[in-house]
Amino acid sequence: MMSVLVIVGCPEPPALIPSVLYLTNQLKKKGFNVIIAANPAALKLLEVADDDKYYLKGVGAVDIDGGLRGIEGINKIISFVHNDGGVSYTVTYKAKYNKPTYAIVFGRQINKDYVETLKNSNIGVYTARAFHNPMPIVNRIKEILANL
């Protein structure tokens, strides 16, 4: 079974957590094993949003820094990026695992520097102007899933 590592940083944008749950559910439906590496606040928000583990059942979860110590069997990485920390983590995870990596760069405005830095690190970049409304992110997720 192929494993996808999902990177989730600071959960400030309201569109982030529902987008992560959507991605996780779609990956599971396609038969992927899913591991989420997230900051502690994002992990707590995911747990509260899905307290019955409808979407998160069978999903691994690690602290975002813990994921850099090494997780066996990662085949692909998908990262949500809306700030410079997200760029740094995505580039670092790509270097650590050397696996195909995709970043969804989103926010009220798209930061061209983030896009350029990620592309220069051989990371597939998808952009979405989204902060409150998750649908632009969901549409990019659909594009990524079509290419997995």
From Swiss-Prot:
Family matches, as SUPFAM superfamilies: Hypothetical protein MTH777 (MT0777)
InterPro entries the UniProt entry points to: MTH777-like_sf, UCP006600
Top-rank lineage group of the source organism: Archaea
Alphabetized Pfam families for the sequence: DUF1890 (PF09001)
Name of the protein in question: Uncharacterized protein MJ0452
Organism: Methanocaldococcus jannaschii (strain ATCC 43067 / DSM 2661 / JAL-1 / JCM 10045 / NBRC 100440) (Methanococcus jannaschii)
Phylogenetic classification of the source organism: Archaea, Methanobacteriati, Methanobacteriota, Methanomada group, Methanococci
